[in-house]
Amino acid sequence: MDSSYWENLLLTINRFLGVYPSGRVGVLRWLHTLWSLFLLMYIWTGSIVKCLEFTVEIPTIEKLLYLMEFPGNMATIAILVYYAVLNRPLAHGAELQIERIITGLKGKAKRLVYKRHGQRTLHLMATTLVFHGLCVLVDVVNYDFEFWTTWSSNSVYNLPGLMMSLGVLQYAQPVHFLWLVMDQMRMCLKELKLLQRPPQGSTKLDACYESAFAVLVDAGGGSALMIEEMRYTCNLIEQVHSQFLLRFGLYLVLNLLNSLVSICVELYLIFNFFETPLWEESVLLVYRLLWLAMHGGRIWFILSVNEQILEQKCNLCQLLNELEVCSSRLQRTINRFLLQLQRSIDQPLEACGIVTLDTRSLGGFIGVLMAIVIFLIQIGLGNKSLMGVALNRSNWVYV
């Protein structure tokens, strides 16, 4: 099936959930705007009601961290709806720029990029929908198939969760397109490197044989021209990536913070469960583990997507250094390209100038995470010591 089919299907799901601009004009666009605002107000209302109805007696800091998920969800969904309603020209412009970059590829390379992107789109879309469908199923079982209770729970948990996951894909998919283009550059440089070497088994007349062979390959300056085109394309990729990060920066930062707080709370509650387990709550434990996997997966996915671009830049630098320099023009072109790549590597992109988006930042996230979880555990142990009895287990059952 054509790769664009899966891309269009994913965009249709995003539009239906009100987190991607409508591709229509006139009345249909206004209807989409009203639908997006309705979903936003529905989630906001449900989240506010959930906060007001939360009356479980637990330590204040624990209650604060637990309830922080709701305003976090409300803020991130509001940003996505804002993008969908008012940021349509920017989204359309970014799509055109990516198409412009891909148009510069040769026919076979272009088809390969679209094919690989279509396969990834199908994989991510299926994984996201199946995972959130499983969360809905566990929620239904947890509430003993009570329709309205399950409907209310899914409205404030799984619906915003699905919308935020799709929002992350809105950023990750175009960045993956850029990565695929850079991967094509890597393969072209690898082919050029092989072309510059004489066939295996050839008799070497002298020490300069390989250089002389490379001169024949570069006859007419074709190698220098190809590398110069790659340098220009890399510059465009850098600009487009920066534009996407500027557009999604605030959303990514809020998403990372929201996921970090949620992971802290879920880890603490799972610790409480295994401290004094009640196996009739095992379904809720599964729900906690799924929620933990979702938030942890989001943090890793956001950071790893950007690190792939960084890795490709390093691969390009390595291949450029391995090329046989056979003319002053080729040498100048390679040096300019290397300088551009090195400058880009030394200045990694940051979301809102706060979070460096690569997996090296993961150590900081883990450090903060463990500090908060240990702090919560110490509070719980301190309360038990003061009271002389175990805390009421009602702090486990609040979903």
UniProtKB/Swiss-Prot annotation:
The chain crosses the membrane at residues 34-54, 66-86, 121-141, 207-227, 251-271, 283-303, 362-382. The keyword Cell membrane applies. Residues 55-65, 142-206, 272-282, 383-399 are extracellular. Expressed in the adult labellar chemosensory neurons. In larvae, is expressed in neurons of the terminal external chemosensory organ. Keywords: Cell membrane, Glycoprotein, Membrane, Receptor, Transducer, Transmembrane, Transmembrane helix. The gene is Gr59e. Glycans are attached at residues 383, 392. GO terms for biological process: chemosensory behavior; detection of chemical stimulus involved in sensory perception of taste; male courtship behavior; monoatomic ion transmembrane transport; signal transduction. It is found in: Cell membrane. One of its GO terms (molecular function) is taste receptor activity. This is Putative gustatory receptor 59e. The keyword Transmembrane applies. Residues 1-33, 87-120, 228-250, 304-361 are cytoplasmic. InterPro entries: 7TM_chemorcpt. Belongs to the insect chemoreceptor superfamily. Gustatory receptor (GR) family. Gr10a subfamily. Coiled coil: none annotated. It is a multi-pass membrane protein. One of its GO terms (cellular component) is axon.
